[in-house]
Amino acid sequence: MVREKVKVSTRTLQWKCVESRRDSKRLYYGRFILSPLMKGQADTIGIAMRRALLGEIEGTCITRAKSENIPHDYSNIVGIQESVHEILMNLNEIVLRSNLYGTRNALICVQGPGYITAQDIILPPSVEIIDNTQHIATLMEPIDLCIGLKIERNRGYSLKMSNNFEDRSYPIDAVFMPVQNANHSIHSYGNGNEKQEILFLEIWTNGSLTPKEALHEASRNLINLFIPFLHVEEETFYLENNQHQVTLPLFPFHNRLVNLRKKKKELAFQYIFIDQLELPPRIYNCLKKSNIHTLLDLLNNSQEDLIKIEHFHIEDVKKILDILEKK
């Protein structure tokens, strides 16, 4: 384990790894700081970085297994201790590292008796196993077992469909997430208007990436998301003759609201509470915190008023209108 004393820069913005350790082959931990930041910046960066770490980084997984001896995934094979389902679950947990794109094939071909572990997987050159000791199956008798595997690189997760069977091959739930967890915390220092912040970022990975590698990749992904905004040319918001500015309304909120009132004028809006509208929990909580309790309260707010609510988005306004128009 490597741990360094935190030294805060008072001028130049800089980041540093202050703690790094490997708890096991499949669990790495890293702790980083970024400072000095102005008030509010640490939370902005921390939230964005956490989402990028958990959702934007690609990983490699086994996504399908095939064997001629398997009638269905809840069956048992004579001479093998584990059920087919247990073998598929064990394959799901194999941690791989690669830079491949697309799909690759791998193979397990073993003669019993004996234990089958990750080191028995015959992999393409572009893929490596993080922990060769990961258990797959136990052969109790002198039988031959061959399993073909499909390996893919992606991000997020992919849940198998129970009816998605191709030529006796079985899909495997895949979690393409090298980062197992990420947290951020904030330390404030200074006085009065000169308060500054330190962002602490903790990252746990499955060993296919180190926390430092994950941080770099998440940062690149965030930068790539914002690059298009740097190339927006001002004239794209004007007509070709540059004489009239084009106004792009988000959507005709006012017109839809007027129509809604006309259609439902017979309703007593003040007696319809927002918890009767079956709104998503986040939208409901945002409205309640802003003292919007009834449909009348809601309709008395303009689009501009609603999007000023903390954690409320323009998409939420549209969703509310869609729900109301269906009532």
From Swiss-Prot:
<dbReference type="InterPro" id="IPR036603">
    <property type="entry name" value="RBP11-like"/>
</dbReference>
<dbReference type="Pfam" id="PF01193">
    <property type="entry name" value="RNA_pol_L"/>
</dbReference>
<keyword id="KW-0548">Nucleotidyltransferase</keyword>
<dbReference type="InterPro" id="IPR011262">
    <property type="entry name" value="DNA-dir_RNA_pol_insert"/>
</dbReference>
<keyword id="KW-0804">Transcription</keyword>
<dbReference type="InterPro" id="IPR011263">
    <property type="entry name" value="DNA-dir_RNA_pol_RpoA/D/Rpb3"/>
</dbReference>
<dbReference type="GO" id="GO:0003677">
    <property type="term" value="F:DNA binding"/>
</dbReference>
<dbReference type="GO" id="GO:0009507">
    <property type="term" value="C:chloroplast"/>
</dbReference>
<dbReference type="Pfam" id="PF03118">
    <property type="entry name" value="RNA_pol_A_CTD"/>
</dbReference>
<keyword id="KW-0240">DNA-directed RNA polymerase</keyword>
<feature type="region of interest" description="Alpha C-terminal domain (alpha-CTD)">
    <location>
        <begin position="267"/>
        <end position="327"/>
    </location>
</feature>
<comment type="subunit">
    <text>In plastids the minimal PEP RNA polymerase catalytic core is composed of four subunits: alpha, beta, beta', and beta''. When a (nuclear-encoded) sigma factor is associated with the core the holoenzyme is formed, which can initiate transcription.</text>
</comment>
<feature type="region of interest" description="Alpha N-terminal domain (alpha-NTD)">
    <location>
        <begin position="1"/>
        <end position="233"/>
    </location>
</feature>
<dbReference type="InterPro" id="IPR011773">
    <property type="entry name" value="DNA-dir_RpoA"/>
</dbReference>
<keyword id="KW-0934">Plastid</keyword>
<dbReference type="InterPro" id="IPR036643">
    <property type="entry name" value="RNApol_insert_sf"/>
</dbReference>
<comment type="similarity">
    <text>Belongs to the RNA polymerase alpha chain family.</text>
</comment>
<dbReference type="GO" id="GO:0000428">
    <property type="term" value="C:DNA-directed RNA polymerase complex"/>
</dbReference>
<dbReference type="InterPro" id="IPR011260">
    <property type="entry name" value="RNAP_asu_C"/>
</dbReference>
<keyword id="KW-0808">Transferase</keyword>
<dbReference type="GO" id="GO:0003899">
    <property type="term" value="F:DNA-directed RNA polymerase activity"/>
</dbReference>
<dbReference type="Pfam" id="PF01000">
    <property type="entry name" value="RNA_pol_A_bac"/>
</dbReference>
<protein>
    <recommendedName>
        <fullName>DNA-directed RNA polymerase subunit alpha</fullName>
        <ecNumber>2.7.7.6</ecNumber>
    </recommendedName>
</protein>
<dbReference type="GO" id="GO:0005739">
    <property type="term" value="C:mitochondrion"/>
</dbReference>
<keyword id="KW-0150">Chloroplast</keyword>
<comment type="function">
    <text>DNA-dependent RNA polymerase catalyzes the transcription of DNA into RNA using the four ribonucleoside triphosphates as substrates.</text>
</comment>
<dbReference type="GO" id="GO:0006351">
    <property type="term" value="P:DNA-templated transcription"/>
</dbReference>
<dbReference type="GO" id="GO:0046983">
    <property type="term" value="F:protein dimerization activity"/>
</dbReference>
